């Protein structure tokens, strides 16, 4: 359905419903309770469009930045078939007060590989894609400590500002090095990163090959357009807490200072989670539903 909620209707310090567009038509829905669940990008944007004025609204956006290291195996892997996500490792999940990274196996469909593999020339890219059946990957999922921000432009469209901090980049560098070691131990005969330039090494290049490769990875860089980074989980832009100066919703998921207005999604996480967030999201929604239902 072509429907977009543009704002929450506030009467004084109380939410009484929402205003939406349905195709060319305007729609108003009045309700005793309004629950925002647009995710960590659109929930803060909706609250900002509605005139909610809290100092941390849209801030602290966490993304679980993710990348991978690839390895070419002698045997056929066919990374697009079989169990989609069957293994993970939390060996490095707590490098510093709960922050670190996880390894996860994820499928590499040809379209995704074409996006992630470095581009040197059409011929090189074609040759690399023909080797895809023999490619394995170590997926990296970073628990980011230092977040970004969601704002809105003049039309109310969400605008995301995010850059991986020096602190989180240090964990990213360690993750890439550890992923290469993992693939090497698994038998990879060539290992590379999804950077904008071809940065690879072969374990048979002799002692110190991986360390020399690490220097070239650093030289290729970790900034935007240097390294392919994706986000699977957006969190913490309407974070929960007891103080309106440092959070957006209270422990009952109600927006500070506004009656009848609640947020129930991953944006209410106080920080990035240390694991995939789906169970926590469901738990938050279940608890919020019980609290709201009891109050109506």
Put a short name on every predicted segment.
Residues 13, 24-26, 155-156, 253:
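Detector for glycine-centered tight turns/loop "hinges" at secondary-structure junctions
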Residues 29-30, 38-45, 56, 167-174, ...:
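Generic recognition of stable, solvent-exposed alpha-helical segments in well-folded globular domains
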Residues 54-183, 190, 217, 223, ...:
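FAD cofactor-binding and catalytic pocket of flavoenzymes
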Residues 37, 49, 143, 175-186, ...:
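Generic, well-ordered alpha-helical scaffold segments in large soluble proteins
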């Amino acid at each position: 359905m072509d429907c977009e909620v543009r704002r929450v209707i506030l009467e004084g310090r109380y939410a009484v419903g929402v205003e939406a567009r349905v195709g060319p038509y305007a729609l108003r829905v009045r309700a005793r309770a309004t629950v925002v669940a647009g995710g960590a990008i659109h929930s803060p944007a909706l609250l900002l469009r509605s005139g909610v004025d809290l100092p941390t609204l849209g801030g602290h956006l966490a993304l679980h930045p993710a990348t991978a290291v690839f390895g070419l195996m002698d045997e056929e892997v066919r990374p697009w078939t079989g169990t989609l996500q069957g293994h993970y490792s939390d060996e490095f999940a707590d490098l510093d007060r709960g922050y670190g990274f996880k390894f996860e196996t994820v499928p590499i469909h040809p379209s995704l590989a074409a996006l992630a593999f470095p581009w040197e020339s059409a011929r090189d890219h074609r040759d690399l894609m023909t080797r895809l059946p023999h490619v394995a990957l170590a997926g990296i999922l970073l628990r980011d400590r230092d977040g970004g921000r969601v704002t809105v432009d003049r039309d109310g469209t969400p605008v995301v500002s995010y850059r991986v901090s020096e602190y989180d980049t240090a964990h990213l560098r360690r993750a890439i090095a550890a992923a290469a070691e993992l693939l090497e131990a698994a038998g990879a005969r060539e290992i590379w990163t999804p950077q904008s330039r071809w940065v690879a090494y072969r374990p048979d290049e002799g002692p110190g090959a991986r360390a020399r490769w690490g220097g070239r990875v650093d030289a290729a860089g970790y900034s935007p357009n240097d390294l392919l980074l994706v986000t699977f989980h957006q969190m913490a832009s309407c974070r929960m807490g007891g103080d309106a100066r440092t959070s957006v919703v209270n422990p009952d998921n109600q927006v500070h200072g506004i009656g009848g207005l609640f947020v129930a999604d991953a944006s209410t996480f106080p920080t990035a989670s240390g694991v995939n967030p789906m169970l926590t999201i469901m738990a938050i929604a279940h608890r919020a539903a019980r609290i709201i239902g009891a109050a109506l």
